[in-house]
């Protein structure tokens, strides 16, 4: 009997030891796991954080049917207006002027790459993308431009792409079925010339310019280097032109409007992030 009692006591003690030991091991495992999580915590630079802020904008531009619908709406409206205009006599040939980026060609893959790599725009990385000649047309652009071309309308592309990128851009456009009526119909950024207004006036010298297309207010008038207040005033003066002579498209990814948030100052990533938050309009609880 005593032997059985001793055996029972030993068995119970051993069980308690094993349970306690397992609990301690589990506790140590949890502690080690938490320490591992702490050790693998990722820290982002200000430039990476700034780049990441563009994620939802790029996703909307690439994935949202609403984005495509806005392009279709703009180009269908332009087609109807052009049909009406073609029935009217003109001394000079009709012409239209279009920006290229996010107006005719979709460059959102370049923006996406910057997000994934935690980088931002540089002339060098942008040129790599342009030289690949892989940008696709935005919804409705090809059909509208082919219609305009077939009806004798002069098509000019006024872009702030570098003059050295004309050949690659022409190849990209032609590959996607976008009409290019000659090298002289691509008016790109020349050294020392920032505003697009002079290039628009050049088109007006020999043609009857009837419509302008773009994703940025500088594609329609001289909105460059203006404060938010000045841009608002100029917009109110031109508001009757939108949906008529001016066709504007959505671009939440970048644009000249952003400089208004920074008051025209050239800020580093850290200060840009701060100014963005300060510019938000919220409400009191």
What positions do the PLM features span?
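Non-catalytic pre-domain segments flanking phosphatase-related domains
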Residues: 2-3, 9, 19-98, 263-285
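C-terminal cap/substrate-recognition subdomain and adjoining C-terminal extension
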Residues: 26-29, 44, 162, 166-285
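Soluble non-cytosolic domains of exported or imported proteins
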Residues: 50, 65-72, 76, 92, ...
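Sec-exported extracytoplasmic/periplasmic mature domains
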Residues: 83, 87, 110, 146-154, ...
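Surface-exposed patches in mature extracellular/periplasmic domains of secreted proteins
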Residues: 86-95, 155-160, 185
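Active-site neighborhood of HAD-like aspartate-dependent phosphohydrolases
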Residues: 88, 93, 104-135, 150
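Ser/Thr-glycine-rich phosphate-binding loops at phosphate-binding pockets of nucleotides
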Residues: 103, 158-160, 215
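Short, acidic loop-to-helix structural element flanking the phosphoryl-transfer center
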Residues: 128-155, 163
């Amino acid at each position: 009997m005593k032997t059985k009692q001793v055996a029972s006591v030993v068995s119970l003690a051993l069980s308690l030891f094993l349970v306690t030991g397992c609990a301690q091991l589990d506790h140590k495992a949890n502690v080690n796991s938490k320490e591992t999580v702490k050790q693998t915590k990722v820290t982002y630079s200000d430039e990476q954080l700034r780049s990441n802020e563009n994620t939802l904008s790029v996703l909307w531009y690439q994935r949202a049917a609403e984005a495509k619908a806005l392009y279709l709406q703009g180009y269908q409206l332009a087609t109807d207006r052009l049909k009406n205009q073609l029935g009217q006599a003109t001394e000079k040939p009709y012409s239209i002027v279009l920006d290229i980026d996010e107006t005719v060609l979709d460059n959102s893959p370049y923006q996406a790459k910057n997000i994934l790599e935690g980088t931002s725009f540089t002339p060098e990385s942008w040129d790599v993308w342009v030289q690949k000649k892989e940008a696709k047309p935005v919804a409705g652009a090809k059909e509208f431009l082919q219609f305009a071309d077939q009806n004798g309308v002069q098509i000019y592309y006024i872009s702030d792409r570098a003059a050295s990128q004309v050949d690659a851009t022409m190849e990209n456009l032609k590959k996607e079925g976008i009409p290019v009526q000659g090298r002289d119909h691509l008016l790109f950024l020349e050294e020392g010339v920032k505003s697009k207004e002079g290039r628009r006036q050049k088109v007006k010298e020999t043609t009857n310019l009837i419509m302008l297309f773009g994703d940025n207010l500088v594609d329609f008038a001289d909105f460059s280097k203006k404060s938010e207040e000045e841009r608002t005033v100029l917009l109110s003066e031109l508001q009757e032109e939108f949906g008529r002579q001016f066709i504007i498209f959505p671009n939440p990814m970048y644009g000249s409007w952003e400089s208004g948030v920074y008051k025209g100052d050239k800020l580093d990533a850290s200060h840009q992030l701060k100014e963005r938050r300060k510019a938000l309009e919220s409400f009191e609880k």
